[in-house]
Amino acid sequence: MPEKLALQAADWRGLRAALVLGMGMAVLAGLGVLGACASSPEAAAVAAGDLLTPSDEPAARKRARIRLELALAYFEQGQTTVALDELKLALQADPVYAPAHNLRGLIYLRLKDFSVADESFRKALVLNPRDANVRHNLAWLLCQQQRWPESFERFEQVLSDPGYTEQAKTFRALGLCQARAGMSDQAERNLLKSHEYDPANPVTQFNLAALLHARGDLPRAQWHVRRLNNSELANAESFWLGVKVERGLDNRVAMEQLSLQLVKRFPLSRESDSLQRGAFNE
């Protein structure tokens, strides 16, 4: 996962499960919120070669778009119920607005109502079959349901789309899904591909480090988790992983430094509690 609808680097609590919204204007563009909506009949009727302008946007679509922007803002802030209220108004204004059905799917995915999420993503695809971001989201939903073969196949279909430009997001989600399915070799391969496209992404860095730590490849795990912990995106989870990696390498100085940062910056965290109890293998 994230914006377009993708994984978000600024809020990565729950690193092992990540389909989050991306940020700002890119999110709105990915939803089809910005500018005229080329999928609407009115927009399609504009003469070939003409520039689509705000005047081409039907009134109902404009109302739906504004409501969708509000819903998205609330969703990103974690106000899921308020986001759903705004989204309902968007769909009342324009029931065939594909981006609204996509966001509806994400909302119900967050609420773990998988049947409604599935219905919403599939409705969005009926309205706009070429939207790779919706196909990505549906693949992630299937992953949450542990429908591994279907999920992997849909991720691969997204990645095979020649016009798709969010490879980092989808390789990351595919790798996370494969890790959940116990396919560590494939997971590592796809997380590394994601890392090639987006080397600073904290979700990728953490999960690569965690995967390598679990299989005993401590030097490579150290390389990834150190990069993360030296960035402003470090958190309790990454510090704790760093502590365990350095402990495995018998690097006492680095282990102490990370331990101090963990306790100082995140004193009430579960990871800080585990450290103080010496629960390194939980």
Listing of model-derived features with the role each one plays in the protein:
Residues 59, 93, 127, 161-163, ...:
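Structural marker of alpha-solenoid helical repeat scaffolds
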Residues 63, 97, 131, 165-167, ...:
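Residue-level recognition of tetratricopeptide repeat
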Residues 37-88, 92, 276-282:
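N-terminal leader/linker segments that initiate helical-solenoid repeat arrays
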Residues 43-55, 230-282:
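Terminal, low-structured helical/coil segments at or just beyond the last alpha-helical repeat
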Residues 100, 134, 168-170, 204, ...:
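TPR alpha-solenoid repeat register
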